[in-house]
Curated annotation (Swiss-Prot):
Residues 1-23 form the signal peptide. One of its GO terms (biological process) is UDP-alpha-D-glucose metabolic process. Gene3D superfamilies: Galactose-binding domain-like. GO terms for cellular component: plasma membrane. It is found in: Cell membrane. Pfam families: BcsB. Keywords: Cell membrane, Membrane, Signal, Transmembrane, Transmembrane helix. InterPro entries: Cell_synthase_bac. The keyword Signal applies. This is Uncharacterized protein YdaN. It comes from Bacillus subtilis (strain 168). It is a single-pass membrane protein. PANTHER family: CYCLIC DI-GMP-BINDING PROTEIN (PTHR39083:SF1).
Length: 703
């Protein structure tokens, strides 16, 4: 039934627009626009790390993406390289774009770092992804049967290599087909986007804005998001998303909506992408508007859930029905999830590109993880195994996971299945998967090149890796215990009721940034795991049956203030927290964070992020960084004036040790108590027996 609903929703999304169209232009006052999107030259890195190719033949595969709406001219590919000074003619580097040779560079032993700039033609500038192959052929010595595969036969490709969209590129307009471009785009550097919300945003508007930011960052982790309220909006000088309920706009945004003729109706969510133009300047703006907060809350997932974002099209959509998909934290990733297709590497192309996927925040480091590979290999590898044992030992596939190699012997793959695939399982350290924010996978082959210069054939040794190969790991259970050692559990991950994050009624830009820090630490797939509400929108009944997070000063939450005497960290008369009982200094404490059983429902937990006093900053990057990396038990932590973070871990450890030490003493005391009682019973019994015997004897003597 759920699949049918999603299909119907997909059909409705497509039916709500006629044909694909570019965003409509809206003429505005010149004072509203800052610098134009045309002035913002964009660069796209081709590789994030140094690439080294070794002769005599080697190659590397790179990709670039032409954004939607970019000009088909004035685009340039820049390759920064340096080659060994031992190379002689006919050494070369050939650049191939989309299987078409573009340029061959002569390498003649000049070891200086060089730059080659390639102007892209119309087909190479077409919107979408394009492949770049860098093919290296290195010769170090003339002659017949001369080995060229030495350590001095190399060329380096620098991370400065890039795609440049020149300043004069004329945007053709954008549409919802390309969302989230131009607000975020994988591969771009220094992307900037603004999210505009009403001056006094409601709970629904805050949640929609933060979840939209979270989605944009899954597409481009380097994108910089700035929150702007309507009254703070002086100029639109970057791609902008406007999120809100119609009746909450009173200034520039209200005027813009009227100029563009946009108004949400009923319970629909209106999505409209427009290009604002004035005096030769232009900027793209996406309006996400609803007539009610309920409509915004229920339908914002069309912008934040990949199930729906790929179905958007046209310049205007009015979303009427949306099936809420039940998201579960995934414990299995295919190479396709990493953005890879089927991969073929071998003698002429020894390494694949790097593929990335956000690391799960709720991955269980105490349980096993594995990479299940589905492979094919060339018959020539098998032939070399039979003929040359040393060659077979060198034939190897290395899987690089976050820089750590994992070896697969290509002569020990076992038997093929009926479809000709080999199935290999590689054990992976689960801690390695959380080493960085993103999991980085690359495949490299060794031992497949022909080492005998007199034995040259056209046989190419290769390994094929199916895109359905999977990386599997365990997800942490939803432990109800209050302990920061398990952060972000139990607040993120799979749960029956979403975590309720409570903010003060007055929400500033800085408070939104604090909220963003907390939700980002939940991980990539956490959009479904939390709900945001302002303090006045939360009742005691809302707080039951779920986990809670409060961000702000205690006095900003009437619900929390009523329970101040039940909080783990006590407060002084002036309202400031007293952390002295946790071996911390009140005088140097700026922020306090603690977790405990919920004071409204002890089956669940709550966490409080607060300034030590007043209504200042409650969440910092230092606190979140500590929580993300912490593996020690702690229920209270503080950040000092010097940005150092301390916890009550040692105190908890001492209490646990004391409890363990007291237990044998108590057991010993109880043992002697039982012995004493037993001895007393025996004495009493003996006395009764003695008295009974005496009475019986007297009675006998009397007779």
């Amino acid at each position: 039934m759920k699949q049918i609903m999603i299909f119907l929703t997909s059909f409705m999304l497509l039916a709500m627009t006629g044909q694909t169209a570019l965003a409509k232009d809206v003429q505005v006052s010149g004072s509203l626009l800052g610098k134009s999107s045309q002035e913002q030259a964009k660069q796209q890195v081709l590789t994030s790390e140094l690439i080294t190719l070794y002769g005599s033949k080697d190659s590397a595969e790179l990709t670039y993406q032409i954004p939607a709406g970019a000009s088909s001219g004035n685009q340039q590919l820049v390759i920064e390289y340096e080659a060994s000074n031992l190379l002689i003619s006919p050494s070369s580097l050939t650049v191939v774009i989309d299987d078409e040779p573009v340029k061959t560079l002569k390498l003649d032993g000049d070891s200086k770092r060089k730059t080659v700039k390639l102007n892209l033609n119309k087909s190479q500038s077409a919107q979408g992804y394009h492949n770049v192959s860098l093919k290296f052929y290195g010769v170090m010595k003339e002659g017949v049967c001369v080995r060229q595969d030495t350590s001095g036969n190399w060329i380096k490709i620098y991370p400065d290599s890039r795609l440049t969209l020149a300043d004069s590129s004329e945007a053709k307009g954008t549409s919802l087909d390309h969302y989230p471009y131009p607000f975020a785009q994988s591969g771009n550097t220094a992307e900037e986007t603004a999210i505009v919300i009403p001056d006094n945003p409601s709970s629904a508007e805050i949640e929609a804005a933060v979840k939209t930011e979270g989605y944009l960052k899954t597409v481009d982790s380097s994108v910089s998001i700035a929150y702007v309220t309507e009254s703070e909006l002086k100029k639109i000088d970057k791609p902008t998303i406007v999120i809100g309920v119609d009746k909450h706009w009173n200034g520039k945004v209200k005027k813009l909506l009227k100029q563009a003729g946009l108004q949400a109706k009923g319970e629909n969510l209106l999505l409209a992408e427009r290009v604002l133009k004035a005096e030769g300047k232009q900027q793209p703006v996406l309006f996400a508007q609803a007539a009610s907060e309920d409509a915004l809350t229920k339908k914002i997932s069309v912008m934040t859930d990949q199930t729906y974002t790929g179905q958007l099209s046209g310049d205007t959509l009015s979303i009427s029905k949306l099936q809420q998909t039940e998201k579960k934290e995934s414990d299995k990733l295919t190479l396709e999830n990493f953005g890879a297709g089927d991969i073929t590497i071998g003698a002429d192309k020894t390494s694949s590109a790097h593929y990335f996927y956000p690391a799960s925040a709720v991955l269980d480091e105490n349980q096993s993880a594995k990479l299940s590979l589905k492979l094919k290999k060339s018959e020539t590898i098998q032939a070399s195994t039979a003929e040359n044992e040393s060659a077979s030992q060198a034939a190897e596939l290395k899987v690089m996971i976050n820089g750590q190699p994992h070896s697969v012997r290509l002569d020990e793959l076992g038997k093929e299945d009926k479809n000709g695939f080999y199935h290999v399982t590689v054990k992976v350290d689960p801690k390695l998967l959380q080493k960085n924010r993103y999991i980085d996978i690359q495949f490299v082959t060794t031992g497949l090149k022909e080492n005998n210069p007199c034995n040259t054939t056209d046989e190419e040794k290769w390994v094929f890796i199916d895109k359905n190969s999977t990386l599997s790991y365990a997800i942490k259970g939803m432990s109800p215990s209050a302990d920061f050692q398990e952060w972000p559990l139990p607040y993120a991950g799979n749960q029956d009721q979403t975590t309720l994050i409570v903010l003060p009624d007055t929400v500033s830009q800085s408070k939104l940034e604090e909220l963003s820090l907390v939700t980002e630490s939940f991980g990539n797939e956490a959009q479904h795991s939390y709900t945001v509400k302002k303090s006045s929108d939360v009742t005691a009944n809302d707080a039951k049956g779920r986990n809670l997070i409060f961000i702000g000063g205690i006095n900003q939450f009437s619900l929390l203030k009523e329970k101040s005497s039940d909080l783990l960290v006590p407060q002084e008369k002036n309202g400031s927290f007293d952390v002295s009982s946790f071996e911390m200094l009140n005088e140097t404490t700026k922020q306090v964070v603690f977790t405990q059983a919920s004071v409204w429902d002890s089956r669940y937990t709550m966490a409080v992020f607060a300034p030590s006093k007043g209504d200042g900053t409650a969440v910092t990057k230092e606190i979140i960084s500590y929580l993300n990396s912490n593996d020690e038990s702690a229920t209270v932590l503080n950040e000092t004036n010097s940005q150092q973070v301390f916890t009550n871990h040692q105190q908890l450890k001492s209490e646990t040790n004391s409890s363990d030490a007291e237990q044998p003493t108590q057991d010993h005391s109880q043992k002697w108590m039982y012995i004493g009682v037993l001895a007393l019973i025996m004495v009493v019994a003996a006395v009764f027996i003695w008295i009974a015997v005496r009475r019986k004897k007297r009675k006998t003597d009397t007779e």
